[in-house]
């Protein structure tokens, strides 16, 4: 997919760069697979901000994605590839031979008219979903489950993929794009191929307003605030943070501070992403 730039008719257009997607469906999404989605502004039921930098944005409807791919041994045809405002990847609308339709994450190279299928013994073909125990070692996959029948949780964003590097007993070893080596149960499902829209990271929004359309509010430095608002705040002129190490607005160390506390799943990580 080519990357295009615009005539510099304004500062925002001068800096913008967009990925051309000629094969994306231009019409409306499939109405039966849409759900309403309300904005929270990053606030909980008490009205307090729990997630910063969220607010505004265009109205969106959620596309119901089939992450389980548990409709086995029934062939499906790709009706079209669509844009999804809720994720970086594109989605594909499938039509099964029994008439049912569903959305899946669109892998790279999948196009309108292709036939795909799910099941334990289906061919190793782009878009097919099957357990890791039946996938050859060395295959690139995406939409990987962490628990059998729970639904895909890994490698779902644009351009992401996972490589199956080994299989031993009831576990399969995966190499993530971050470099992490992780074991998952071989009964977990995965989809053949890598996620499409791999040039998503090359786009440039061009202006702050484009970020606001996405529902993202500005990020303000703590050192630019008052002492009442942030531990880094206050001081004369452009003072530093004044702390031995940088902290969050709630005093928790940040910028390199390790926050992973889940020891239960640590046993499944053979090598961390930091080596």
Curated annotation (Swiss-Prot):
**Which parts of this chain are annotated as the region Disordered?**
226-261
Q: Name one GO biological process term.
A: cytoplasmic translation
Entry GO terms, CC: large ribosomal subunit
Paired cysteines (S-S): none
A molecular function annotated in GO for this UniProt entry is: structural constituent of ribosome
The source's superkingdom equals: Bacteria
Pfam families cross-referenced by the UniProt entry: Ribosomal_L2, Ribosomal_L2_C
Asked if the record carries the keyword Lipoprotein, the reply is no
**Which keywords fit this entry according to its UniProt record?**
Ribonucleoprotein, Ribosomal protein, RNA-binding, rRNA-binding
Q: Assembly and interactions? A: Part of the 50S ribosomal subunit. Forms a bridge to the 30S subunit in the 70S ribosome.
| Family of this protein | Belongs to the universal ribosomal protein uL2 family.
Function field: One of the primary rRNA binding proteins. Required for association of the 30S and 50S subunits to form the 70S ribosome, for tRNA binding and peptide bond formation. It has been suggested to have peptidyltransferase activity; this is somewhat controversial. Makes several contacts with the 16S rRNA in the 70S ribosome.
Q: What is this protein called?
A: Large ribosomal subunit protein uL2
Organism from which the protein derives: Xylella fastidiosa (strain 9a5c)
The gene for this chain is rplB
């Amino acid at each position: 997919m080519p990357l295009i730039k615009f005539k510099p008719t304004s500062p925002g257009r001068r800096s913008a760069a967009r990925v051309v997607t000629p094969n994306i469906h231009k019409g409306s999404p499939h109405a039966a697979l849409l759900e309403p989605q309300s904005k929270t502004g990053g606030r909980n039921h008490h009205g307090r901000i729990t997630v910063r930098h969220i607010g505004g944005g265009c109205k969106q409807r959620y596309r119901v994605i089939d992450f389980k791919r548990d409709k086995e041994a029934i062939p499906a045809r790709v009706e079209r590839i669509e844009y999804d405002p809720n994720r970086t990847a594109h989605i594909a609308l499938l039509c099964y031979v029994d008439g049912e339709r569903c959305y899946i994450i669109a892998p790279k190279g999948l196009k309108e008219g292709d036939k795909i299928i799910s099941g334990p013994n289906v061919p190793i073909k782009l878009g097919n979903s099957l357990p890791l125990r039946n996938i050859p070692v060395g295959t690139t996959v995406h939409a990987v489950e962490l628990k059998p029948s729970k639904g895909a949780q890994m490698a779902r964003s644009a351009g992401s993929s996972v490589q199956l590097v080994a299989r031993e007993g009831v576990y399969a070893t995966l190499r993530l794009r971050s470099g992490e080596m992780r074991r998952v149960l071989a009964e977990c499902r995965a989809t053949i191929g890598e996620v499409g829209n791999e040039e998503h990271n090359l786009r440039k929004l061009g202006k702050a307003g484009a970020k606001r359309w996405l529902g993202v509010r500005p990020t303000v430095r703590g050192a630019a605030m008052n002492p009442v608002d942030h531990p880094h705040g206050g001081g004369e002129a452009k003072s530093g943070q004044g702390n031995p190490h940088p902290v969050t607005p709630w005093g928790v160390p940040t910028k390199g501070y390790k926050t992973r506390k889940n020891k239960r799943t640590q046993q499944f990580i053979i090598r961390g992403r930091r080596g």
